[in-house]
Each structure stands twice: as structure tokens, then as C-alpha cells.
Amino acid sequence: MAALAFTTGAAAQATTDEPAPATGRASRTTVYQGSFFTQYAPRTALDIVQRVPGFSLDLGATQTQQGSVDVRGFSGTAGNVVINGSRPSTKAETLDVTLSRIPAQQVIRVELGPGDLFGSDYAGKSQVLNVVLSQQAGIDGNVTAAAKRWYTGYINTDIQGSALIRRGASTINVSAGTGRNRQQEEGTDDIRDVSTGQLVEHRRKHNSYFNKDPFVSAAWGVEHGADRAFHLNGRWQPSRFDLFQDNRVTPVGDPQHDDNLIQTYRDPVIELGGDVTRPLAGGALKFVGLATRRKRNDVDQYIQRSGLIEDNAPIDGGFRQSVHARRNETIGRVTWARSNLFGLSFEAGAEAAYNTLDDKVDLLEIDQNGQEKRITLPIADALVKEKRGEVYVNLGKTLSPSLRVDGGLNYEFSNLTVSGDAVADRTLKFLKPNLTIDWKPGGGWHTQFSVRRTVAQLNFYDFISVGDLSVHRVTGSNADLQPQRAWELRATVDHPIFGDGLFKLDLGHDQVSLLQDQILIVDDQGNEFSGPGNLGTGKRDFVTLTLDAPLGRLWSGLRVKLTGTLQRTRVEDPISHRQRNWSGFWPTWQYDLSIRRDTSALSYGVEFFDNRHITFFRTDEFDSNMNRGVFVSAFVEYRPTPRMAINLSLDNALDTHAARDRLLFLPNRAHPTAVFDEFRDRDQHRQISITLKHSFGGATGTRVASKGN
């Protein structure tokens, strides 16, 4: 318990080797000193963050339950981790990647507190973690080499390394990696006529996915204090993705034939960002600049044959699609914050962002003679530009040692134009208020209540039509799409359990207008597509339980963490006019249970995960994804020396399959003439991995930095 403490006013009297908590943070944060994490033998700051009791890493708005999304601007994309009290000036590099670049030896402590302690970007968040780094001069680093064996016998290898060099107030952090991740799976598709139940077609498939994301990143910082700092960072990643699919098709009543799906994507990204903080009028003035440049050069090919490859069957048709796009973003931001202005904490700021997307899609049908015929899409060539601005002010006041109120108002405005195959010009303006009440009623209990208005951003790619050859469909475009608006209500209650464990309960309700989903789109020629559009009012209610329990009384080093969510989403379907769930990853229930034990030289554990199926409600199909059982992974890690760790892990230990069930309506659900069910079963089988981790530098690899280290 000596490693865990609630901060007091004395915390401000830190040595020069240990940055002090900011004024007003005392008594509102839980501090975990470096010695607390020694039992887990962390190698990076990410390992430490993942071991903070009751804490779950939030990667920010660009990484959501729906996957990676394009969120423009800087203010609305924060996660829930800061480093030395500041947010990293990057968007291309996610929080987990940034944290994995920091050697654990450099971490003195972490501070867990409510979001208002760390600025307006985190207002309303019940938990934000501050990773405090050592100021001791020296060099620390890590090298990680991994190998994973797939069921085919293929072994994927990957290596990456990082180093942190500190001299006085200056810190340089560099990292690089091969970013190799090849995955293999096999499975079957069965298509049946719903009206008769008869099998129409059977397919046997083998897929090979290969992500090659080598990267080089570097960051330089000079920190003389919370109000005197400079940071510069950059990242280059020439991303590649390749898919090769073998597909043996057996139509009922017709001969077998072999098809192939080949995807070749080249999507490089480069980013340069930085910030400068200077004292002004008793507070801190901060400038942030960020420039990101992305390219897409994607080619999909579907090859059809008249028979089997082994019989030298010729190609008798197919499809080919190419996507060439440039996506650029430039951001400038200025903020001024003061911890005590007439008895209030105060922050005000402004942000400007300029975004462009230049995108061209070519979708071709290839006949048996190799002749290409262009398939007309509603919008296949367009240039999208957006000028976005936002100004805001946030105020907070501690009314008593146990009660604090924070509130703010954001004003967002943007001008968006579309040219090319479609023409649009619109100006959007929104007010976004927020209010948070943080209350500690006593007895170790902590609660937080918040309400805020949010406005979603339009995905630029929703303005461009595109085909998906893996499922033989086209998604239409919509130049008239509107951003959905929501009022979000949150309530959180937490309490320590079993010493350094935590009980946490989160409740939430979202009231959404103009919910973004799929609607029926008709082009000028009368062709009908499923595409992005706005529905009516949507509602979401959820409850999330987190139990992080140290069970050392039962068995030394034993710890169990359970996270479970129940939720309900409702919206009126645009075709049936019945209430249904939202499209996307909004499962009715999901859970994650991890059990691990840590000793001085050995750690081992097991993790269980599952969720209810989720559905994408298109106008021409119901596309459902599901697990066919619980997914289980296990690991054991041995540390033969203080600087070395060997990790052996088993993924998908129960050989659980995943599935996709597509209910297809021809031509669409509005007036179907035929309905088919396509059930896809996929299995990646068990995977065994071995990872070697080695630390170097002034501190050992089995402990984080201690005071004065």
C-alpha cells in the first residue's frame, strides 16, 4: 500500500527530479508510485498504463467502436492519457503507440484524476491518467522481437525498438519498427434461397491478409516547467496492405470454378506537429500546430474463371476498382489557461483547421474477352474542402473539498464545399455547452455527473461512391448528408476495493437527432443504392461495470479484472418504420475478463472476451457479425534477467470461429423480389507467439523509475 496514495498539499514540494502536481490537483487524484508496478515488470509506459487499477485506455475519437474514423481538428480527438500533464501534439500516432515508445524506466509515477484537471479537451471524462516522467539525464530504450505461428505453418516476424535520450531539460525520443502483421484464415460461405431454404451456392475460401506498416517516428521536447515548454514530433509510415483470396465456388447444378480476390493498397502517411507554451498574465499560453498528409492508392480485383485452376481454366470475367485519393489536414490552435482567475480555473482557446480530400474512383466490369466496361457511380470523382473553426471557454470552481463544478461552451463553425461529379456548398454552426459535477460524498466514494452537447463530423469519404468487391456491392454517396447531434448524459461512481483495487460503475444516455446511418439513394438515372444518410431520433442507454480486484489474500500476486457492458440503442428504420438497433458495433452486451498472477520472475494469465452479434442495417441487406463462442487467450512471461523478458502466448485457445450472416434483398428492402441468406464462417485457428523484450540504459528493465533515478 505504500505505493498508492491520495495526493495532498505536500505533493507540491517535489524535488527537481520529480515534476510536481499542478496547483489544485491535490486531493483529487490517486497516485501510483513507480514501485507499485514493479510486480508487473513493465517494459514501456503502455505496460504501466494497462496495469493501473480500474483504468481502461481510451485512444480518442479517431479510434472508436466502429473502428478507425476520420475526425478533423485537434480539440475533439483527445483520449484519456496525458504525458507530464500535456497532450501529445499528434493524431497519426495513437496513444498506445506513443506510450509504447516511452521506456518504463523513465516513468516516476502516474496520477489518476477527473478530466477537468488536464484541460478542456478532457472535460467530462471521469478518468484521465497523467504519466509523469523522470528528469534524470541518461539513455533508456527497448527492443522487441516477435514471431507468431499460424495454422498453415507460416511464421510472421516483427521487430521494433525505441530509445529516449535526456540531457538537462531536453528529451529526444526515437522509434522505428517493421510493422509486419500477416494473418491467415479459412472458411466457407453458404447461400440459400430464403423462400425455399434450398442451398444455391457453396464456397470454400482461404484468405491471407498482410499489413506492412514500417514506421519511423521522432520527438524532441524541452521542458523548463508547465508554462515553459517546446515539443516537436514527426512520423512517417509507408503503409501497405495486401489480400489474396482463393475461392472455390460450387453452384448447385453447375460445375465448380475458382475465383480470386486480390487487394493491393498503398496508403502512406506523414505527419509533423509541435507546440510551444509560454507564461502570460499568471497563466500559460500554448500554441499547437499540426500537418498531416495521407495518400490512398488502392486496387481491388475480382477474377472469375470458367473452371478450376488445376485444369487451366481461363479467366472469363471479373471486376476491378481503383481508388486514388489525397487527404490533407492542417491545424493551428491557441489556448490560454490559468488555474486561479478570480477564484476560478479558466481556459479559453481557438482552433482553425483546413481539410481537403481529392478522390477518384474507377469501377470496371471485365467480360470474358477481357474488355472493360465502366460502371457508372453517382459520385466517383470529387474534391472536398472544409474550413473549420472553433472557439471555447471553460470555467471551474472547487466549492468544497468534496465538490467541484466545471462548465464550458464551444462554438463550432465550418464551411464545406464539394466539386466534381457533385456540387455542394454549406455552412454549419453549432453551440456545444457542457457541465460536469464532481463529488466525493465520503467513505472513499467518488461520483461524477456530466451533460454535454456533441456534433458528429461528416466523413469526407461519404461524399464518394465506392464498390466493395469482397461482398459484391456498391455504397452510394450523399452530398446532402448532415452531421448528427447528440445530448450525452453520464454518471460515474467508483470506490476502492481490497486495498488497491477498484469498483467502477458508468451509466449513460444519448439522445441523438439526425442519426447517421444508411438510406436509399436514387441517382439521376433512377439507379438505387444503399448509402449514408440521416434518420430520425436515436436513443442509447448503457451501463458499464468495472471490477479490478487484487486477490493476493487467496494467492500471492493474483489479480482479476472484469469489464462488462449492457446497452440498448433504438432508432426508426427508414424502410420498415419499425424501431431497431443502431448500425455498427453497438452490441447488447459484451465482457472482458482477465486473470493473471505475477511473481518476481514469472507472470502468467488468461483472458476471456465475447459480445453479442452486431448488425449493419443497409437498405439492401442486414449484415450481421458474430462470435461463435468465447475467445480465449493465455500467456506466460519469464524474466531470466532484470533486462530481459520472454513472453509465450496462445491466441484463440478454444479455436473459436467468427461468422457473418448477410440477409440479402434484391433489389432492396423497399420492394424485394428475392431474398437470400449468405452465411460466412471464418476460422483463424490457434496462434502461438513468442516475444523477446530487452531493455537497455541506466535503469533495469524490471522496475520503473524511482525518485531521483
Task: Identify the function of each model-found stretch.
Residues 46-87, 128:
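Extracytoplasmic beta-strand/coil segments of soluble accessory domains associated
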Residues 86-114, 161, 218:
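Short acidic/polar hinge/loop motifs at secondary-structure boundaries
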Residues 102-140, 695-700:
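A beta-strand signature from Gram-negative outer-membrane beta-barrel systems
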Residues 162, 457, 562-571, 582-640, ...:
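C-terminal beta-barrel architecture of Gram-negative outer-membrane proteins
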Residues 295, 415, 439, 443-489, ...:
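Surface-exposed extracellular loop regions of Gram-negative outer-membrane beta-barrel proteins
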